[in-house]
């Protein structure tokens, strides 16, 4: 949609977005600190997530990385846009290939004063993101998380195409966050 509208969504850091802004600074050769970047792509209201729609308790949802929340929402939208209904894909050989890289939310949770809960493992683990999609949508094909830094989404798409060509799955959902 952004490409179609020609919109630029890169902007300055929103107030209160970083608990410790020092992580955004780098040391110069002279020993002074400079902000590595003044801009970023930030999703407004990233904490707004209809957990109950996906059968997730509010307690568990608090520990789910926004990347996983968005993958669920966008995955659902992609299936709807493709005209797929639950009966068509539930228990199907659908593969999920997800490109993920950062652990910012996990670092944020671990920096909180109270002890994290068990849900941190499933909510912030990059390896569990594709499994969450497969489980939620009832897919029974390959479920692969990909971490190749900046190329993760592209590699996820490549692996999805490869899996389709090899008949390892009948349909594939490729995503990246």
PLM-predicted stretches and their roles:
Residues 1-177:
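Cys-dependent condensing catalytic cores that perform Claisen condensation/acyl-transfer
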